[in-house]
Every structure is written in structure tokens, then in C-alpha cells.
């Protein structure tokens, strides 16, 4: 896949898929249908504004901050010393237990081939056909866990390189 390295163009959608066919013209992977599934994260907020907010306050988009109620729940469950030690540990790391990502779904939506979840991108096929799905993570900061409910998937390539086929229920695709 390709993407821009200028300013915040990638975060504004300057990316796309590139599929390079084998030089021999003979693809060792046989499929009745072949789809590129390009996954990405998207915000309507200008990426430079997002970056500015994160530079001023790294947890700006993290609304699930630890509360006094949770602290007292920890005290009753684990004791005062353990509850305070837990808070100190997170403070020393300068993060909190809910800090999974810099930006949350509050600000992001997720796209499949440029379509929002409401658009419901669909790849057509007939029962019994072998369908090749070329998943690409074009997200700026999102890891995607991919599964097709009720179906197994066979991984045959990673980063464009053929691999020993392995059957899985789910794959995780990291940020490039």
C-alpha cells in the first residue's frame, strides 16, 4: 500500500492499495474472487488539531479516568496500602489503566475500503467459492482484529510474501 509522508495527508485519506502481480503471471494462490480490504481509522477533526491537543494533554481523548469511587472500591477490596500503591504505579508511568490508545472511538470512526460502518461494505461471492481477501491496515494508530463470524480463514501471505498456510479464527493487523 502507499501513503503520504507530508504533513497530515495520510490521516486525511492520502493512501491506497497496490497489488503487484507475480512477474511470471502465475499466482500460486488460486481464488475465485479477489478483494482488497483496506482498513483505516478516520476523524472529522483536523489531524493537526488532534496532534495539538495531544501535545498539550496526552490523555485529552481518554474520558475513562480513574475515579474516587474506584479508589474506595480498591481500598475495600485490597486495603489502603495496595490501593495507594496501585495509584502510585500508574502515576509513575504517567498514564492510567484505561490508556489503551491516544485517541478513542469518541473521536474516531473506522473505515473499510473508505466506507463507514453505516455503509456496510460488502464483497460478493457464491457459496463454495474460494475468496481471497487482501487485508491492509492503513490506520494511523489502530490495530485491527479481523474475524468473519462462523468462518475460518487461511493466511497465505503476510506483507506480500507467501507463507506456509495456517488456518485461523482471527488475525490482528498492526500499524505499518
Q: What residue spans do the PLM features occupy?
A:
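Histidine-centered copper-binding motifs that mark active-site loops
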Residues: 1-175
